[in-house]
Amino acid sequence: MSRFWSPFVKDLVPYVPGEQPKLARLVKLNTNENPYGPSPKALEAMRGELNDNLRLYPDPNGDRLKQAVAEYYGVTTGQVFVGNGSDEVLAHIFHGLFQHGGPLLFPDISYSFYPVYCGLYGIPFEPVALDEQFQIRVEDYQKPNAGIIFPNPNAPTGCLLPLQAIEQLLQANRDSVVVVDEAYIDFGGQTAISLVDRYDNLLVTQTLSKSRSLAGLRVGLAVGHPDLIEALERIKNSFNSYPLDRMAIVGAAAAFEDQAYFEATCRKVIDSREALVEQLTAKGFEVLPSAANFIFARHPQEDAAQLAARLREQGVIVRHFKQQRIAQFLRITIGTPEMNQALIDALS
């Protein structure tokens, strides 16, 4: 702590990101990265930007990427916001749409950045307990609030809330912004973007870090009513007018345009997930239903923290959370078949 800090800084509880180990031989199943590389067309597009134009600022609006997203989802560019990773997009949402005095609602087991944003922006919040099966109960969100946000599929559980239930939640909260954080939606869910034309209080966020294999590029987006998008643009242009560099804009746009590669890699991850669930179940693990590129599992005879430590000793890294309700679970990223087999071998 320094005497130069602003008073609020000492009270912040920052987000703790997943470990990024430097040892190349480790099997990394802890941060939900895609085990398959980016679209070759995305790489080609980015290489095309390695020229003298790097002396120029990028398009502050990211219009090429907005157009690609709009065409992909059948919306207008005025319904699309793009930013430097979905975490930045979420930060702008918290800053611009959730500061209304009342409590923000989100699941008690959820993305751990949500309470961090609340602390940063002084937003009161109320965690809403998942049920015994770690599912969201829509009826629990039918109470006064200043906004609602939840991941779908949820993180770190991987459980999916059906589109019909999301619509029920929207109908019950017409005067609140409802944000559906769809970082993992492409691995088994149906996007809520299909609802944005019917609900002016709906905002859907996505990332290119997972299903499009561009975690190192830092690109995120939001789709919603133009009034909500305008609020995010106002926040962005009061903070950083150029959040995406020239390579990020063209690379992300090309990734959206390469539908065949996207579908093929998602299919491989889904198939590997189902195979890994079967293998872990055979070893006595309880695995929650997952629509994500990870699974959430526990073993009735193993302490999760100790198991994670023993796996690391054998060169396999998974994610353990200390939160009491899930302290006996491990979150395991879906890797290639070879990476998943390394996990099974280590468990054996």
Swiss-Prot record:
One Pfam family from the record: Aminotran_1_2
Catalysed reactions, as listed in the record: L-histidinol phosphate + 2-oxoglutarate = 3-(imidazol-4-yl)-2-oxopropyl phosphate + L-glutamate
Cofactor: pyridoxal 5'-phosphate
Class of this enzyme: transferase
GO molecular function: histidinol-phosphate transaminase activity; pyridoxal phosphate binding
EC number assigned by the record: 2.6.1.9
Keyword Transferase (UniProt): yes
Key words, A-Z: Amino-acid biosynthesis, Aminotransferase, Histidine biosynthesis, Pyridoxal phosphate, Transferase
Gene Ontology BP, a term: L-histidine biosynthetic process
Annotated metabolic or biological route of this protein: Amino-acid biosynthesis; L-histidine biosynthesis; L-histidine from 5-phospho-alpha-D-ribose 1-diphosphate: step 7/9
InterPro entries (UniProt xref): Aminotrans_II_pyridoxalP_BS, Aminotransferase_I/II_large, HisP_aminotrans, HistidinolP_aminotransfase, PyrdxlP-dep_Trfase, PyrdxlP-dep_Trfase_major, PyrdxlP-dep_Trfase_small
Record-listed N6-(pyridoxal phosphate)lysine modification sites: 210
Subunit organization: Homodimer.
HAMAP family listed in its UniProt record: HisC_aminotrans_2 (MF_01023)
Record protein name field: Histidinol-phosphate aminotransferase
